[in-house]
Structure formats: C-alpha cells, structure tokens
Amino acid sequence: MKPIKNTITYSICLSMSLLSQTFAQETTVLDEIKVSTENSNYSTQNDNYYKTKSQSATKTDTPIRETPQSVQVVSNEIIKELNAVKIEDVLDYTSGVSRQNNFAGMWDNFSIRGFAGNENTGMSLLKNGFADNRGFNAPRDTANIESIEFLKGPSGSLYGNSEPGGTINIVTKQPKFTSEHSIKTDVGSYDFYRMALDSTAPINDNLAYRLNVATEKKGSFRDDIESQRYVVAPSLLYSINDDTFVSYMGEFIEQKAPFDRGIALIDGKNVMNPKNFLGNPDDGDVTLKNQTHQLKLEHYFSDSWSSRMGVAYKNNSLKGFGSEVTPSTKITTDNINLRTRYRDYSSDDIQFQADLQNVTDIKDATNTLLFGVETYRFEQDSILYTNKDTVRVDNIRSNPTYTVLKTGLGSLSTDKYEEQKGVALFVQDEVAYKDFRFLTGLRYDEVRMDNVNHLDSSSVKQNDYAVSPRVGITYLIDDMWSVYTTSGTSFRPNTGTDIDGKTFEPEKSVSIETGLKFESEDKKTGGTLSLYQIQKKNVLMTDPNDPDEKRAAGKVRSKGIEFDFNGKITDNIKANFNYTYTDAKVVEDSTYEGNELLNIPKHTSSVLLMWEDSLSLNSSYGIGTGITYVGRKAGNVNNDFYLPDYTTAKIVSYYKVNKELNFSLNIDNLFDKEYIASSYDRSWLTVGNPRTATLSMTYKF
C-alpha cells in the first residue's frame, strides 16, 4: 500500500493532467448552457415548489424519478413559506429525520433513518457537494440557502465517509446575470429581530455576484438566554465562455449564545419548569466562528464530455464557558451542584475534488460514466478545562437561585491534537435502456488519523481502508410512475479513543431499499414510498462506566417505511405531506442489546397545506397550516425513560401588496404545546419552543 501522502499527490497530479489535456481539445459551443446553465451548478430555475432534479444524488443530471434512491428536496419556496431561518426549521417536513443532542444549542444534529453519526461532528452534511460537518459548526443559517437535498440511504459510493441513513446536501444561492435585490425584516416573540439582504447582479457580460447578509438578535422564553448571529456570504460566477464556468462561494458566520443544556428530570419523572435555566448566568456567551471558501471550475468539452474541479477550505472555532449538570446525574432534591467547563476548540479543513463525466448514446441505450478523485486534510486542536462543583442552583423546581462556589478555569482535562488525511477514488456508471435505468458505483477510501494527547505526551495512529459498492435499478412504468430497488454500503471512521486509550474500528453498514415513485405529467407534484433495512456495526455509544466516555456497540439495525409527497396540486393549493415508521434498535451488544436508539420515534408525520389566490393584477395572498406529530422515543441509551409524543400546529400566511412589497405572519406551536424535542440523558433535556409569532416584511428593488 502506498503512503497516503504520495497517493494524494499522485491523484491531484493525475486529475490536473487529465483536465489540461482535455482543455487542449477542440470544444463544442453548447447554446443551451449559455442560456440557462441548466446542466451546471448555476441553474437559475429555482422557483418550483416541487423539484425534479437533485445536484448531489448521482452527481449527474439524472432526474429524481429515475434515480434508484429516495431523494427529497426542500425548495427555496418552502423555506420562505415556513419563514425558516435555520435548517432545523424545515426538518419536520421531511420523512425520516429526528432531532438529536444539539450540544447546548451550539450546532445542528439530526438523525436520518435512525442514524445520527458521530455526536462530536453531527450528521452527514454536505455544502455544494463538499463535506461540511467536520469540526464545530454553528447552526446553519438559511440566508444563503437555495435548497436542501435529503439523500436517503447510503451514499458511500459517491461521498465515502457518510451515514447509511442518508446525507443532507445544502445548495447555496448562486449569482444571476439579472439584477435582483431584496431586504427582509423579521420581528417576533421574545425579542426576536432579524434583517437579511439578498443582492445579485451582473458586474459585466461575463461576471456576476451575489451577496447575502443577515444579522439576528433574539431572546428566549427561557430565563437568562439571549443570542446573536451574523452571516456574510459573498459569491461570484465567472463565465469564461459558453463552455467554462468558475464560481466562488464564501460564508462567514458568527454566533454568540449561552451554553444551555436545557432542563433535567427530578426524581426520575418530574420535569423542571421549562423556563428555568440550569446553568450559570454569569458564564457569558460561547462564541462560534465559521468561515468557508469554495472555488469550482466546470467545463464542457463537447456534447459528451464534461468535468468539474473544486477546492474548499473551512475554519471553525468555539470558545467560552459553560456550566452544566454532570451527565447521568440523578436529581432528587431542589438543589444541585454544577460543573463548569471552558472550551477552546479550533479546526482547519481543506478539500479537493475532481471528476470527469462522459455521456454516450449506443443504439437504444444512453451510458453516463462518472469517475473522480477526492482528498482532504482535517486538523483540530481541543482544549478543555473542567472545574467541578462551581455553582449551586437552589429551588430548581420553581424560582432558581445561583450561588458561585468556585471560580477559575479548574484543571486541564483535555489538550489534544487530531489530524485526518483522506483520499478516495470513485467510479459510477448509469445506463438508460428503454424503460430501465441501471446504476452501479464503487468507491475506495483511505483514511489516516493521528491523535496526540499533550497531557501525557502520548499519540495514537489509525489507518482505515474501505471499498463501498452500490447497485440500483429503476423501472419506468409509464410517464408518471416508477419503481426502484438499491443496495449499498458505507463506512465512517470513528475518531478518538475509548476509556482505555484504544482507537475504535470504523463504522460499517449495509443497506437495502425498494420503493415506488410518482411524478405528475406537468412536473408540479411528486412523491416517494420507500421501504428499507440498514445494519451497522461499531456504533459509538455512551460507556456505562463513564458517561463522558464512549464505547463501540456491537451492531444496530434500522428498518422502516417512508412516504413523501409535495407539489402544487391546483393553481390555488400547494401541499407537503410525509409519514415515517422507524424501528431502530441495538441487535448485538453486551450492554445495550434490544434497546431502542436514542431520540428515534417509531412514528412521525407532518402536513403543510397552503391556499393562494390573486386579489388584483400584482396583488395576492396565501394562508395555510402545518401540523407535525412526533411519537414517543427513548430518552437515553439505557432506555430507562422515554420522551412523550407530541403534536404541534402552525399558521403560515402572506399578503403580496405588489411586485415589490410582501408581508407575512407565521405563528408556530399555535396551541402552545409543552414538549421535549430531544435529550441526551435524564440531566440534559432540550425543551421545545412555546407559541411564537413572527411578522416579516420583504421589499424587492
């Protein structure tokens, strides 16, 4: 086996050589690309409620109906309809997605089909096809999001290091060669204030820009919680000629918020007042800063050949104090001592991608061949100070009071450096023959990890290798209906060490799925019914001997049924409906066998209905309702308590005065239902938001 450094260097040189040789060939002008760039990442066709294509499902132009995989796309229209400002605001309206431990509100963390990934990195998440979940990321803001793609099932043959339940790909807004500008303001309950700018225009005939800016300040129904958020996202699109495009996407996010683990169980059954803050108000804010840069080159050599190349860089940091109940603490009285931790985490992530695509017609068949290379290097420094019994909270059931017992950083409990290097080669072949669509894919991954513990000057090295195949078949029954079946594998390196300092084996999984798809002839509505089963081994779970440590479970299994439908049913009615049944549990383990996976309800469902009508030539209105149901779910890995089911409702409405001015009013949790959204264990319960109202105004110019 060649050293990974040499493999990375060779792969990059090979890709550069292939591209440079092909650039020298005579190219064919593709007029349709010049008009809409529909086959590239820069399509401006973003106004559809229902999406017929996904950028990331196959990395090709294959329609969703012909893809042997369940794919749901939340369009920008749905994002605006829900007045979503973070991606968690839309996840209730997609099947198979459940909330997980969000690290005291510091990041996004959700599971798909029962699998949440590493809790120190969160779910499998991409941004424009680049990995976006390594390091500590602030909750993603929708200010520069065009759509959110949910790729169900394993994506290991294309994306390698991913979860078998599915992957989320965020598609950011792209520059346009038309002038469009808007300012949006939001005012809402609990001192919520937000302003966002979206501006795009051509700089000249070949260069266009887009700038998204957002600033947000909000309070909370919970005591002593206020937060701020700032987003700046510039992007550029340069059309070198009709065949060649260069794009840049930048994103700068800063979030300041208190470290809030939520509430806790008292006597194992009574929940605290959801307004009470179980922390130290004097800790101040935890500050997260993320900056992302992506540069892509896309070239069409001819009608048959095209290629993409890209590089991405991301820097993350998290700093601040946070006081919390020690996990798994059993609270039996009205007072509790907290521990205080100071965290100083920083990371750098650089990635390179290149692929080459060929489309060939052979008699009755069309063959689409894709092959490429990916490399990355990720580094993270983690410093953690722990000070025990620093704050005593009294009267936690009613009116908490806080007494500081100790100050200072405490002892240095973690000081480590982690480095990951990865390289991958992948190939995918799609064959369209009459009414059949065949897909095969294969990816080879090589990952090297170095973990250095500065506390005892020890280091642990780990090398992982994986081959991830995928096969799938789709049969087009007629112009609207299709059936598919697919199977694939995925792998994900487990970072860190166990309580004895030993590294973990990588997670490996096998998945099988079959389904039925529908798409109306006018392409305005569509739906998917899917059945799946996934088995996965070496999943990290809480060590029963130390809640701050992890151990690898033997094997877990998830199986279920999902149904999604959305689109514009009539000229006046739009609908989004989904239902999920998930049976996810540990099937082999010395401690947890038979237990349900954390925060995974067996049943979830949601519906969003919207009525729209015109009032005059340029004036219109819309009003609708959304209802979500989340079933009972395990509150910790031991399954010794469960979170009850809940149903919430919301009202969405807007009034479009004219082409320039629009007002909207959204009311969430209409009936003010109290519920627990997720938990980590009995001492960390995340409280759902009560009834809130938000009034928004958008002005286009």
Which role fits each region the language model picked out?
Residues 293-316, 338-452:
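Face-selective signature of the C-terminal outer-membrane beta-barrel domain
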Residues 17, 31-178, 183, 514:
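Acidic, small-polar-rich N-terminal luminal/periplasmic segments of exported/outer-membrane proteins
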